[in-house]
């Protein structure tokens, strides 16, 4: 019997890593699309920045990980590039950071400043994933690591929410979310939000936190 040593996940069925990643993207799509409808500029800008940083960091990491060792042999740029990326940089190295970028975008508020998104995305992918060895080796969720770092460093900006046509109550600009109020220890604090509004997402919160209806659609 031949024992093959590979990184997780280890599967014994037809589904593969690529298929699982696509399933995750499909599940996230309803919430992401609705976020783009409600906050078109904020969502798209944050998403593009997160995608560029996380996929770019993955690309650089693969190149450094598989580069030629230092020696006296002269090689062309093409040879070095093919050695680093051919067979090593696959569709999974695009899909996995893309998923992290989408999740990171959805767990950040629409009003988050661009510099917080940039720093959070970079810290998330590097500290949360790449330092552990990359795909299949990380023990933390890169999106969660990035969000926590951004929240710790830019706490005041993190609780700033942008009123829109969908949710334009004046006091929605800043303050605690329903989840934050529950975390404060009292369910009574959330009675200011009608159940229908909480279900439809007409409450303050991060992009992917408030739209319960689209989250359920993604689950289905």
Each predicted region: which residue ranges?
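N-terminal signal-anchor module of multipass membrane proteins
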Residues: 1-59
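Short, amphipathic, aromatic/basic-enriched membrane-interface segments that mark the entry/exit
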Residues: 11-21, 62-67, 82-92, 108-112, ...
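Short hydrophobic alpha-helical membrane-embedded segments
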Residues: 20-28, 90-99, 117-122, 194, ...
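Hydrophobic core segments of alpha-helical transmembrane domains in multi-pass membrane transport
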Residues: 28-35, 50-60, 104-106, 122-125, ...
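Structural signature of hydrophobic alpha-helical transmembrane segments
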Residues: 42-52, 111-120, 203-212
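C-terminal ends of transmembrane helices
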Residues: 56-72, 79-82, 125-136, 217-220
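A generic, well-ordered mixed alpha/beta core segment in the N-terminal half of proteins
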Residues: 75-82, 93-168
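Long hydrophobic alpha-helical segments that form multi-pass transmembrane helix bundles
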Residues: 136, 142-216
